[in-house]
Amino acid sequence: MKEPGPNFVTVRKGLHSFKMAFVKHLLLFLSPRLECSGSITDHCSLHLPVQEILMSQPPEQLGLQTNLGNQESSGMMKLFMPRPKVLAQYESIQFMP
């Protein structure tokens, strides 16, 4: 007598679990990571997956607005990246030169 194979519900649940785990790991990979030293300091560096692209080209070529007015005094450059059009707000990211 032939062994019955896995039923459709079991296979479907397993596939759903695999998809959810894959999406979770993908989101964790793409999410920004905040790296700090062990002590409490006033400086942390934000590492984004697209940081190499942003730093390799001038912001004007990428369509980003820069605020260079206070760069000499603060030693930082601010980039304003538009969020999706649904929110219509701006997100500020600072890079140390």
From Swiss-Prot:
Query: Tissue-wise, where is it found?
Result: Expressed in numerous tissues; not found in breast, heart, small intestine and liver. Isoform 1: Predominantly expressed in the testis. Isoform 3: Predominantly expressed in the testis, at lower level in the placenta, during malignant progression of melanocytic tumors and in several tumors of varying origins. Isoform 4: Predominantly expressed in the testis, at lower level in the placenta, during malignant progression of melanocytic tumors and in several tumors of varying origins. Isoform 5: Predominantly expressed in the testis. Isoform 6: Predominantly expressed in the testis.
Q: Which cysteines are joined by disulfide bonds?
A: none
**Remarks, miscellaneous:** Potential cancer-testis antigen, with expression restricted to the testis and certain malignant cells.
**What is the protein name stated in its UniProt record?**
Down syndrome critical region protein 8
Q: Which organism is it from?
A: Homo sapiens
